[in-house]
Amino acid sequence: MSNKPSLSYKDAGVDIDAGDALVQRIKSVAKATSRPEVVGGLGGFGALCRIPTGYTSPLLVSGTDGVGTKLKLALQLNRHDTIGIDLVAMCVNDLLVCGAEPLFFLDYYATGKLDVDVAATVVTGIGEGCKLSNCALIGGETAEMPGMYQDDDYDLAGFCVGVVEEAEVITGENVTEGDVLIALASSGAHSNGYSLVRKVIEVSGVDVTSSNEQLDGQSIQDALMAPTRIYVKAIKALQDTLGSSALHAMSHITGGGLTDNLPRVLPDHLAASIDTSSWQFSELFTWLQTQGNIEQSEMYRTFNCGVGFVIVVPKDKADAAIKTLTDAGEKAWKLGEMVSREADAVVYR
């Protein structure tokens, strides 16, 4: 026999027992998000889900996303309870753009050293996001990778699948001149632009871990970490009230802001004319712009600037759409209109 010590996986930095403990902690989280279509529970090699009844020609819609360097701020502030909501929101809001109903969600959690309490807190947030989206958390992967990440660092990715009736897919091809753009308010910076947010914090000299500064009636920490708003229920209410045919286009305002995201869903011959007087920057965005001396054009192409989602509807449907969205709990307003395109796809006036 060799005199060398017998090595275990734990000696290499991977604690299987911690992983098992996490699974036990989060089983109830996943169960609380279940839908009737889900077959089985956590722990299998693959998760099963039926397509909901009532669809004639269903199309599956998939998406994946993360939360960027907002994670670095979460780690700095030791706030892990809402970052999971961010993860779900980034995925499900993308699926909404084509008119899809989110069905199920999976997450990937990678870390240098698994902290079961932190991971369970994150997954609890994912579960909360899934409940807000009527979306089942049906599986995921937790990877402990010593040497790949610093001990406490972790990264997240989310994966979502939804369903839409083929005849009701929203493509943007029906957008016409004179259509109205309706804005849905964001809850803050959502999950985009946080590398610039962190740079602004650095140059401002503000210690965000201890600052008592208030923005928008809340602590600067709460303002910076406010979870991304989930628009699933509001868009469902709009579809039920107006019908999908009245929703000519939708856009989730993420990285790239209004400037880069609106053109993704608009015809090449039309431009979105944005009425910049229709809303005011929140104190958060004003603080970021002032502390970072950021040009207005850079604000519009980096942050959502208070507009988290945009819907394009016929002019005669605008008032009904705003009322429906308001009744669903959203702050909604007329953001602008579609005009003939001369140069830029988005025009600020």
From Swiss-Prot:
A matching Pfam family: AIRS_C
Main location, first listed in the record: cytoplasm
GO cellular component: cytosol
Gene3D superfamilies noted in UniProt: PurM-like C-terminal domain, PurM-like, N-terminal domain
Family: Belongs to the AIR synthase family.
Catalytic activities: 2-formamido-N(1)-(5-O-phospho-beta-D-ribosyl)acetamidine + ATP = 5-amino-1-(5-phospho-beta-D-ribosyl)imidazole + ADP + phosphate + H(+)
Keywords: ATP-binding, Cytoplasm, Ligase, Nucleotide-binding, Purine biosynthesis
Top-rank taxon: Bacteria
EC annotation from Swiss-Prot or TrEMBL: 6.3.3.1
GO terms, biological process: 'de novo' IMP biosynthetic process; adenine biosynthetic process
Keyword ATP-binding among record annotations: yes
Location of the protein in the cell: Cytoplasm
Annotated signal peptide: none
Biochemical pathway: Purine metabolism; IMP biosynthesis via de novo pathway; 5-amino-1-(5-phospho-D-ribosyl)imidazole from N(2)-formyl-N(1)-(5-phospho-D-ribosyl)glycinamide: step 2/2
Natural source organism: Psychrobacter arcticus (strain DSM 17307 / VKM B-2377 / 273-4)
MF-aspect GO terms: ATP binding; phosphoribosylamine-glycine ligase activity; phosphoribosylformylglycinamidine cyclo-ligase activity
Name this protein carries in UniProt: Phosphoribosylformylglycinamidine cyclo-ligase
Entry annotated with the keyword Nucleotide-binding: yes
NCBIfam families per the UniProt record, alphabetical: purM (TIGR00878)
